[in-house]
Regions:
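Intrinsic N-terminal pre-sequences and regulatory tails
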Residues: 216-223, 234-236, 290-292, 316-317, ...
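Short beta-turn/strand-loop junction motif enriched in small, turn-promoting residues
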Residues: 28-32, 292, 319
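Short flexible loop/turn segments that cap and initiate beta-strands
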Residues: 35-39, 290-316
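Non-catalytic cap/lid and distal C-terminal segments of serine-dependent acyl enzymes
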Residues: 1-269, 283-286, 350-369, 381-386, ...
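Short, mixed charged/polar active-site loops
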Residues: 18-22, 295-296, 336-340
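Insoluble glucan recognition modules
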Residues: 272, 278-280, 317, 321-327, ...
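Beta-strand-rich structural segments
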Residues: 281-294, 330
């Protein structure tokens, strides 16, 4: 039996961007055994991580997921085109013009040029080289973080080319943790285009991508006429951070949505706060519907029952509207599925809580003024970093402590460790100890200790 293949195109030169990069192409198992067959195409950003590991040892492993889903008959065979980014040009190429004109990243935004590169250079080359179905209804564009943002922008600007858009954890807003200022990085489109859209976000991404911003864009899509559960799928991923492993864990869902069958709903899990305030931050429920295919999504058009509607009301989108103090049970009910959640309404909940964090580092740590542990930590003493910070109530962080990209913590032997995680539902005091660093030889600690 034939197997899928990965083709490397290197270098691929762009006359528009005046640079070169590697493009990887996944060809399905039947490609070389049936020369009459043509295939839908998925174009993906950050292509070097689509099939291969990043500096953290993580990958989307899209080829493995596509192989599995097609072998199970759950989706059509497709071609996947993974377009690598150029390291020092990634942010510039993935950013279209900012609506407020601010140049947040001190670089010239080249999103429009990158868009031209994809539409007029990459896609024509792929269509000429491989047996593709060229029409928009067979062509998808997908990315995560800044790659999700550029996919969103290109999709709305080029709907005659791309009929399906996957925006995973799209980087719509840069948040200044010190001031909590929101700096929007993109226009938000208010007109409806002939697109199928998948949009998601994890609940443990800290300040990197916050659900309230992604949800704001999702609400705008629904106001424009996109139907949740129809031409728009939204997913608020519980326990999910901002890394390749998180996107790998759920990429099957947009693949099924674009190229397969999502199946039948079999279970719903109702997530939400235990307490909300008559005065305080707005809150919403997150009913995650699971399907027999493995597909999942957040239902933004649900039916709810409340034991006492005089205490709280719930909109179809899951918004909680507190009326007075008290305790209620909220019940989700749709498509034969039910789930319940107990909720208390209190007079007031502050929007911010205090997190005090300290990190002790080993002797072998190279000199650095700051660490990153979900929050940027300054040095406050010898081998000690930390401080007290104000963060939004309920925010979650998933992280490894690091000194920068490719310089994260490991165990004492240099092996990878699990991600750390915390949720700031109330004030917290946290203390961590780093054993070693991935970029420091494992025996450095002993040598430096011996040298005093």
């Amino acid at each position: 039996m034939s197997s899928s293949r990965l083709i490397e195109i290197n270098p691929f030169y762009s006359h528009t961007l005046k640079n070169e990069r590697t493009i990887y192409v996944y060809l399905p198992p039947s490609y070389h055994s049936d020369d009459r067959k043509r295939y839908p195409v998925l174009y993906m950003q950050d292509g070097q991580h689509v099939f291969f590991k990043d500096r953290k040892g993580e990958s989307w492993d899209v080829h493995l997921t596509v192989d599995e889903l097609t072998a199970q008959g759950r989706m059509r065979e497709i071609i996947v085109v993974a377009v690598s980014h150029v390291e020092d040009a990634r942010i510039a190429e993935y950013m279209h013009a900012n609506p407020d004109g601010h140049n947040i990243f001190q670089t010239t935004n080249q999103g429009e040029l990158y868009e031209t590169f994809l539409v007029r250079e990459v896609k024509p080359f792929i269509d000429e080289t491989y047996r593709t179905l060229t029409e928009k209804e067979h062509t998808a564009l997908m990315g995560s973080s800044a790659g999700g943002l550029v996919s969103y922008n290109i999709g709305f600007r080029q709907p005659e080319t791309f009929g399906m858009i996957g925006a995973l954890c799209p980087f719509f807003v840069s948040v200044d943790p010190a001031t909590m200022e929101d700096r929007w990085l993109s226009a938000v489109y208010t007109d409806k285009k002939p697109l199928k859209i998948w949009m998601d976000v994890g609940d443990a991404e800290g300040f990197t991508v916050m659900e309230k911003h992604v949800r704001q864009v999702a609400d705008t899509l629904m106001e424009a006429g996109y139907k949740p559960g129809g031409d728009f799928m939204y997913y608020f991923a519980v326990g999910s951070g901002h890394s390749q492993k998180d996107w790998a864990a759920r990429v099957h869902a947009p693949l099924l949505y674009f190229f397969g069958e999502i199946g039948t709903p079999v279970r719903v899990d109702l997530h939400g706060p235990e307490r909300i305030g008559l005065q305080g931050p707005s809150c919403a429920l997150n009913p995650v519907v699971h399907y027999d295919s493995g597909f999942m999504m957040t239902d933004l058009d649900a039916d709810y029952e409340v034991t006492d509607p005089g205490i709280v009301e719930v909109t179809a989108e899951g918004r909680l509207l507190p009326k007075r103090e008290g305790n209620v049970t909220v019940r989700y009910k749709r498509q034969g599925l039910t789930a319940s959640l107990d909720l208390t309404v209190v007079p007031h909940l502050s929007g911010m809580v205090s997190v005090t964090m300290f990190v002790e580092v080993p002797v072998c740590t190279p000199k650095t003024d700051t660490l990153y542990a979900g929050i940027e930590l300054p040095m406050i003493g010898e081998r000690l970093y930390g401080g007290t910070f104000q963060v939004p109530r309920g925010i979650s962080f998933e992280f490894r402590i690091s000194r920068g990209l490719g310089k994260h913590e490991t165990d004492a032997s240099g092996r990878e460790i699990p991600y750390r995680k915390f949720t700031a539902r109330e004030g917290l005091e946290l203390s961590y100890r780093v054993e070693h660093w991935v970029d420091v030889p494992p025996d450095t600690e002993a040598k430096e200790a011996a040298n005093g």
